[in-house]
UniProtKB/Swiss-Prot annotation:
Residues 1-20 form the signal peptide. Belongs to the nematode transthyretin-like family. This is Transthyretin-like protein 52. Disruption phenotype: Loses ability to bind apoptotic cells and results in reduced ability of cell corpse engulfment. GO terms for cellular component: cell surface; extracellular vesicle. The lineage of its organism: Eukaryota, Metazoa, Ecdysozoa, Nematoda, Chromadorea. Expressed in the intestine cells. It comes from Caenorhabditis elegans. GO terms for biological process: aminophospholipid transport; apoptotic process involved in development; recognition of apoptotic cell. Changing residue 43 to M: In sm211; results in increased number of cell corpses and abolishes secretion of the protein.
């Protein structure tokens, strides 16, 4: 058994690096909260790679906080197994902007178009007081 590991362990390590693809992404945007304009300051924003395979969890690609005007820029890299399998990025935004109807605050998840560097994903205005079920 130990001989097997000695001979084949380097192969498995090498093949994992060869068969995975690393991609990096940058996303920018401006957070808006019409119900409380001050709530766009220092908002926690995570960039995640969704892994839908069984026994895999999503990977944190990057993290940032918005500035006092709600501007943010988040960058990160992720690797997915397979030469044609690219990361599936999304933003997870934890905020304190009250919903325009109910005053509740819920985190927002936004799928990001997988445009990898050198391209930049420009999200424009991201309204924190509206949710998908509003539309």
């Amino acid at each position: 058994m130990s001989r097997f590991l000695i001979y084949f362990l380097p192969f498995f390590i090498y093949s994992g690096n060869v068969l995975s693809k690393t991609s990096c992404l940058m996303a920018t945007g401006v957070l808006k909260c019409p119900t409380d304009p001050e709530a766009v300051k220092k908002v926690h924003i995570d960039l995640w790679d969704e892994d839908s395979l069984p026994l895999e969890s999503d990977d944190l690609m990057g993290r940032t906080w918005s500035d006092r005007n709600g501007n943010f820029q988040v960058t990160g890299c992720a690797s997915d197994f397979g030469p044609i399998n690219t990361p599936d990025p999304y933003l997870y935004i934890q905020h304190n902007c009250p919903h325009r109807d109910s005053n509740a605050t819920n985190p927002i998840q936004i799928d990001v178009i997988p445009l990898f560097l050198p391209s930049i994903v420009r999200l424009g205005n991201v309204y924190l007081d509206r949710y998908l079920e509003d539309y």
